[in-house]
Amino acid sequence: QIGFRNPEFMKNPLEANLKAIHSEFTKAREIAPEGVLGFNIMAATKEYGRYVMEAVRAGADVIISGAGLPVDMPKFVAEAEAKLRFGDVLEPGIYEKRRTMLAPIVSSIKSAMVICRMWDRKYKTAPDFVVIEGPCAGGHLGFSREQLTEYGADTDSVSVTYKQSVYEEEIRGIIKTVKEFADKYKKKIPVI
């Protein structure tokens, strides 16, 4: 959690994290005044919506989000931006007018499809870019034990057993899925 260095973290982790979003963003902006700055926020985090909205208030250019399906990220970003512009008045079309880029982390065709369809249906928007994390990335990717075995990523010697060509087929499917929504929204959606 971003606020773990704050002496008050153990008493009030939420407040420590919200304050740290601003202080870390300020430090990063001093280092890179013209750079693109963002936050990687886990969708499985207990206060996910609050953290996303606070990152927008801090001035984030992009929110990258995985560790679960960030299906409501567009809502949190658009509402935070609308409140910055208009106070508590949420006008129609706020999801199409956002400035903060949205970048979900996906590991499968299915996760890319769920996110893109949900964002399209609920918020009339699509990702600005998509990050792929494969079975060797570790972390919170949601691969089943069977999938890890299929990709050869379930052993201590992954560098020898990993079946890159098998996962590359999944990557091609993710790119194809994202392209459908890029075409629909008439915009480029890089897949990283």
What are these regions (language model features)?
Residues 187-192:
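Glycine-rich adenosine-cofactor-binding loop
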Residues 1-185:
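Active-site entrance/lid segments in N-terminal catalytic domains of soluble metabolic enzymes
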